Amino acid sequence: MFRSILTKIFGSRNDRILRRLNKIVIKINQLEPEFEALSDDDLKAKTDAFKARLAQGETLEQLLPEAFATVREASKRVLGMRHFDVQLLGGMVLTNRCIAEMRTGEGKTLTATLPCYLNALTGKGVHVVTVNDYLARRDAETNRPLFEFLGMTVGVNVPGLSPEQKREAYAADVTYATNSELGFDYLRDNLAHTAQERFQRYLHYALVDEVDSILIDEARTPLIISGQAEDSSELYMTVDKLIPDLIKQDKEDSEEYQGEGDFTLDLKTKQAHLTERGQEKVEQWLTEQGLMSAEESLYSPSKISLLHHVYAALRAHTLFERDVDYIVKDGEIVIVDEHTGRTMAGRRWSDGLHQAIEAKEGVRIQSENQTVASITYQNYFRLYEKLAGMTGTADTEAFEFQQIYGLETIVVPTNRPMIRDDRTDVMFENEEYKFNAIIEDIKDCVARNQPVLVGTISIEKSELLSHALKKAGIKHNVLNAKFHAQEAEIVANAGYPGTVTIATNMAGRGTDIVLGGNWKAEIAKLDNPTEAQIEAIHTAWKARHEIVKAAGGLHIIGTERHESRRIDNQLRGRSGRQGDPGSSRFYLSLDDALMRIYLNEGKLNLMRKAFSTAGEAMESKMLTKVIASAQAKVEAHNFDGRKNLLEFDDVANDQRHAIYAQRNTLLDNEDISDTIDVIRADVFNQVIDQYIPPQSLEEMWDVPALEQRLKHDFALDLPLEKWLEEDNHFDEDALRQRVLDAAIEEYKQKESIVGEQTMRSFEKGVMLQTLDELWKEHLSAMDHLRRGIHLRGYAQKDPKQEYKKECFQMFTDMLDALKLSVVTTLSRVQVRTQEEVEQAERQRQEMAKRETASMQYNADEDSGEENTRRVGRNEPCPCGSGKKYKHCHGSKAKY
């Protein structure tokens, strides 16, 4: 209560920040006449002047008003667009490590030019991050003329570029890229074998477009570079046959309830669990198949892999639906992004789930993969010195942005007042009645020439509605993962009078739906359009634009509420852009997933009783509260999941930083001999400690075993016992030093043979290769540990603390193994002098000549042709071996 009173008096924090920033907007506006008077050359010269002032100690904050005024004036001259005051506000928000919530159609692409130019003045590079290749290319080409006018270079980083093209893109002042490509390039850089193979430079400033999609919706999706593991496709096919015989049970067994089913499902977390009855049934079937013995349990340590296959197959059949979670395309399983409805080509589910779905659908099962390198988007984007983002819907997730990324969300006002009519939700008893009402609403809109965008949550639902519209005789376009190629054209036409478009979730996001259709897209289709053609197209568009405005603008129909209010707002946000008219309404039913999963049976029954007649629609404040309550539960659950993921991944992240920092140091230094010397001393001391414990009596020493170990692991044949006999006063420290000196002397002899440069290169190669191999094994071990760590909770232990503790020990063990492996490899390597190499090469060439001659003589003999001169048995063999012919090739000759 007191907070609301104070807010009314002083305004919200958002209002106070905007008031402060508005003072800077006034300064920029006051500079406009001065900058308008500048010639093009004088305006271009501002960039070098700003860089010089930065070098002299001025800050970006001090340069901001003039820099923004420069970009605004350049945009007017080059692009024909002037930044509105609200876009200047948005630019300042993005400069201050914040997230700017800017409504659809407010010009986020143009707004981004302001902070990008300012931060690029440092010369450290700026990354503009988009959700797909199309948007990265489009935005780069749109803004390229502006940046190049101001002396800035622009790069585009999308999949499929050559190494040279990638380096060029990253070297640019402003680089447009997709989030996935940036993350994968970071991982690739940390798998590089030379410094020249790396692409990325210092991660300075990232501006993330559609920041909610990347930092929240995709936060739980790790980026993984993997190599093939062992093939177990046959086992997936075998286990797949078992699942259809299992029976679902509605809830888990307890003291009060004993079910008759084999498994239960948790739809919230998409997990499946076998009941005791189910476990017995599965074990019996696996025993019959010869995959386990009757005495063994599915949960015994030796059968964990088999259990893993069973659960993967169970989840594939019961929790993942075709045309909802994935599609089958060209004989492959392609994941459908649950948030955008787009296909995610190249992505694969982990934990064997993808292989289980391939077995279920009867397509070729690809080998499982072993993780070589991985990182989450959460941890990748936290690597940037400065991070900012923009989206049309961020305020509902402001708490998460602040908690996880330290980013404050600022809502930027619209340039023109929002006049969209957001109507009350309508609830129906079942899906059939709901679809009937939706079709009637669409018919009414089409009759009035009002365009309609219908949002669905899955491909399956979009096709169901499409079928219903066909039966009703209503022409429409469908935009989902199956028709991804036509996305741009469908979105461009979605604003035409009376056009009906069905879209899954936010497919087409990032492209504005223009009332009356996109006239610029029409012109782009023409080859060398004339002024007359352009004028005709624009005139026709104006007429259509007025028709649609008179009909009420774009009408949005939501066929279900999504799990998050933010995604509902994204759908609504497609209408009412830049002060245009528009309307929206959500149609719901008690069959909707949100209702079934997150409302208890009591509330659902109460709501069913509220419907007195078939097909009745219900609108009430109670309904709005119930839906808001369900969405709040989902959002809290999802936030906890992402936070939990981050807490676990932070353990790996700290270790990743340490390994990658060490790796980069190795790549950047040609000479790592000092590091090798330190490692060698550590390893020999640890090895000696095992046989001669520190501060111990001589009776506890095992010198013969130490001699054997040094000979076997380090190729050092040292007479330790003889040394001790020769010197009665020979103590432990002296022995250690003598062993180390002998190892160093042996190593220096090898170095003198091959040369210092060769040995330095070899050391670096061994270190990198060993580090990569052990890190890969460590990632796999951490993954296995994480899968089962939740079981520690049953022993009253905190799984997170246990995970941290064990991962730290595993990491320490890995570093010890790294040192030992490197020193062992370097000690055991055999080197040869240049003379020995040349002699071996001569022998190889002589052997090759003999083999050639042998083949020739054998060919002559086998051909049946007689030689003009027969070689005598006691003459030297013509092959050059030096032997008599009868003891060489003559032994095979036919006389």
From Swiss-Prot:
Membrane disposition: Peripheral membrane protein
Location of the region described as Disordered in the Swiss-Prot/TrEMBL record: 833-895
SMART domains: SecA_DEAD, SecA_PP_bind
UniProt cross-references to SUPFAM superfamilies, sorted A to Z: Helical scaffold and wing domains of SecA, P-loop containing nucleoside triphosphate hydrolases, Pre-protein crosslinking domain of SecA
UniProt feature, compositional bias: Basic and acidic residues: 833-852
Major localization listed first in the record, in broad terms: membrane
Coiled-coil features, chain-numbered ranges: none
GO BP term, example: intracellular protein transmembrane transport
UniProt binding sites for Zn(2+): 877, 879, 888-889
Catalytic activity: ATP + H2O + cellular proteinSide 1 = ADP + phosphate + cellular proteinSide 2
Enzyme Commission number: 7.4.2.8
Family matches, as Pfam families: P-loop_SecA, SEC-C, SecA_DEAD, SecA_PP_bind, SecA_SW
Places the protein is found: Cell inner membrane; Cytoplasm
Compositionally biased residues, Basic residues: 883-895
GO cellular component: cell envelope Sec protein transport complex; cytosol; plasma membrane
Keyword Transit peptide tagged: no
Keywords, comma-separated and alphabetical: ATP-binding, Cell inner membrane, Cell membrane, Cytoplasm, Membrane, Metal-binding, Nucleotide-binding, Protein transport, Translocase, Translocation, Transport, Zinc
Single GO MF descriptor: protein-exporting ATPase activity
Function of the protein: Part of the Sec protein translocase complex. Interacts with the SecYEG preprotein conducting channel. Has a central role in coupling the hydrolysis of ATP to the transfer of proteins into and across the cell membrane, serving both as a receptor for the preprotein-SecB complex and as an ATP-driven molecular motor driving the stepwise translocation of polypeptide chains across the membrane.
NCBIfam families with a match to the protein in the record: PRK12904.1, secA
Complex formation: Monomer and homodimer. Part of the essential Sec protein translocation apparatus which comprises SecA, SecYEG and auxiliary proteins SecDF-YajC and YidC.
Protein name: Protein translocase subunit SecA
